[in-house]
């Protein structure tokens, strides 16, 4: 909720409030946190009076069971390291990676443990520098 005050000289004689969406970054960070802590489930079939019923149970019982607010999954993601025409993935071979990053663009993650080649480039470029005389005597 956001609010704004109205009045003379910034006084808050009238206050108007409205609901607003959180910052997009906050929402993204929240969803990423949920994704990273998602619980893997197993589909079990059992017979009841009305026929076969499928239920989900946590794959790993030593973790606490997921709540209604947690994300769950029962199929693993495909291997994005190798090309897969079915999913349209080209794999990660020959991609440019960032040696100093530990994020998704880092070589350890992006190269899927295959190792990476490092190339050093030297470039001569015009810097478009301009000399500004700063001071008078």
UniProtKB/Swiss-Prot annotation:
Domain of life: Eukaryota
Alphabetical list of Gene3D superfamilies matching this protein: 3.30.2460.20
BP GO terms, sorted: canonical Wnt signaling pathway; cell fate commitment; neuron differentiation
Entry's Gene Ontology cellular component terms: extracellular space
Keyword Glycoprotein carried by entry: yes
Principal cellular location given in the protein's record: secreted
Entry keyword annotation includes Disulfide bond: yes
UniProt xrefs under PANTHER family: PROTEIN WNT-3A, WNT RELATED
InterPro entries given in the database record: Wnt, Wnt_C, Wnt_CS
Keyword set, alphabetical order: Developmental protein, Disulfide bond, Extracellular matrix, Glycoprotein, Lipoprotein, Secreted, Wnt signaling pathway
Family: Belongs to the Wnt family.
Entry protein name: Protein Wnt-3
PTM comment: Palmitoleoylation is required for efficient binding to frizzled receptors. Depalmitoleoylation leads to Wnt signaling pathway inhibition.
Source organism of this protein record: Xenopus laevis
GO MF term list: cytokine activity; frizzled binding
Cysteine disulfide partners in this protein: 3-17, 5-12, 97-112, 134-135
Glycosylation sites per record: 98
Known role: Ligand for members of the frizzled family of seven transmembrane receptors. Functions in the canonical Wnt signaling pathway that results in activation of transcription factors of the TCF/LEF family. Required for normal embryonic development.
